[in-house]
Amino acid sequence: MIGILDYGVGNLKAFANVLKDLNFRNQIVKTEQELKSCTKIIMPGVGSFDSVMDKLSESGIRDVLSDLVMSKKIPVLGVCVGMQILASSSEEGTKSGLGWIQGKVKKFNFDQSNSLLTVPQIGWNEVTSIRDNKLLLNLEKNPRFYFLHSYYMECEEDNDVIAFADYGGNFTCAVNRDNIFGTQFHPEKSHHNGVALLRNFASL
């Protein structure tokens, strides 16, 4: 069972619909008991870093989530701000992140040479894979995904980065450490490439 984590933020039904079309059992989960029945977890996230961390803490499931991911090694996929909270901290706020992947979330800060670029980045962008990874199997070369964000993760360990995109310079847009995965882009909004990526995650 794939659990789509409902902690008050994120586009939950879009993930559920894609997974249903792919014939993967899934449910939107809110409670500890529901979460414990999951074999994989998707963490959507929309909003600010601090508000998402607050929502996760207020939900009462943070400790169980950490146990499932860090001790029982259940695969987890963080999306957009759901990926950012995998990091240790963010320039956007003062809260600590989950710290499952060491790094800091930074804001796009363009000089005059990139003055035509807007923040947030909204729309489609090519993604370049750095290394072979189960999450990115069978995607077309330089696939395009949908982005909507002002911040990006800067990892301390290069090996945690599996893909980057270019927006005024290269930035990390997908990460993986052991059973922990993250995408800055929105696979649930990215048509066939997003469907392929979610199929890969669901098949782990």
From Swiss-Prot:
Any one Pfam family match given in the protein's UniProt record, by short name: GATase
Alphabetical keyword list: Amino-acid biosynthesis, Cytoplasm, Glutamine amidotransferase, Histidine biosynthesis, Hydrolase, Lyase
Superkingdom to which the source organism belongs: Bacteria
Entry's Gene Ontology molecular function annotations: glutaminase activity; imidazoleglycerol-phosphate synthase activity; lyase activity
GO cellular component term, pick one: cytoplasm
Gene that this polypeptide is encoded by: hisH
Chief location: cytoplasm
Subcellular compartments: Cytoplasm
Protein name according to UniProt: Imidazole glycerol phosphate synthase subunit HisH
Organism encoding this protein: Leptospira interrogans
